[in-house]
Amino acid sequence: MVKIPKSHPRYWSLYYREKIIEGMEKGMTAKAGLIAHGRGEAFDYLIGERTIEPAERAMRAAVAKLLLAENPVVSVNGNVAALVPKETIELARALNAKLEINLFYRTEDRVKAIAEELRKYDPEIELLGINPTKRIPGLEHERGKVDENGIWKADVVVVPLEDGDRTEALVRMGKFVITIDLNPLSRSARMADITIVDNIVRAYPRMTELAREMKDYSRGELIRIIEEYDNGKTLNDVLLHIRDRLTKLAEGGIWRKKQLD
């Protein structure tokens, strides 16, 4: 991994870009994952590279739903394993959720590489998806495979940085689907039950904080949070945030400004 000086004004952006490249070199991340990361980074620029209120609202609803779930599962793909392996394990622990390796471009080598990366942070962690025996209806080839004891039986599934086709297929199966996607226009964002429009490197640590905070909430409080949540409004509010921010930047000028609000 290329060493980036912390004095660089785009340190964190470059750092995570290198993590994705490293993930590909380790055999975890598919080439298409690099393209997906770049697309997400572009939307992160638009929202201001921070967690905005609609994302916070979505995270609270997502955590409430996961805490009430009987069989919650957090899906892990190559980009997730490259960017937030430790944070993924911490989130699953906080939610008492299972972890399943689930890949669009599935190969046994990629599954093995992701499992090895996750086990660096917890050698005893139970990982599902190593030998999946079930298939999501309507999805052909390797991308449709899921673990019988994981996503197949899950009532609530977290599918971060996910393909829209699979998100939609999981919804058709009757799963409650939560996605983390920086692109509010993507099919995953539009088809999920709860869409967290935020960078996963910010979202997972915050969701872990919320899980620890909300685990003592009453069942009634958690249900109220979910019932009051409107995913359509969340997506609309994200688009309005982007519009208003770009309008403000255009009116105030950006030429030679070192920082953009």
From Swiss-Prot:
Which GO BP terms, alphabetically?
coenzyme A biosynthetic process
Q: Which superkingdom, per the lineage? A: Archaea
Pathway info: Cofactor biosynthesis; coenzyme A biosynthesis
Top class in the EC scheme: ligase
Sorted alphabetically, the keyword list is: ATP-binding, Coenzyme A biosynthesis, Ligase, Nucleotide-binding
Per the UniProt entry, the Enzyme Commission number(s) are 6.3.2.36
Q: Which GO terms describe its molecular function?
A: acid-amino acid ligase activity; ATP binding
Q: How does it assemble?
A: Homodimer.
According to its UniProt entry, the function of this protein is described as: Catalyzes the condensation of (R)-4-phosphopantoate and beta-alanine to 4'-phosphopantothenate in the CoA biosynthesis pathway.
Q: What is this protein identified as?
A: 4-phosphopantoate--beta-alanine ligase
Which source organism does the UniProt entry give?
Answer: Thermococcus onnurineus (strain NA1)
- High-level lineage: Archaea, Methanobacteriati, Methanobacteriota, Thermococci, Thermococcales
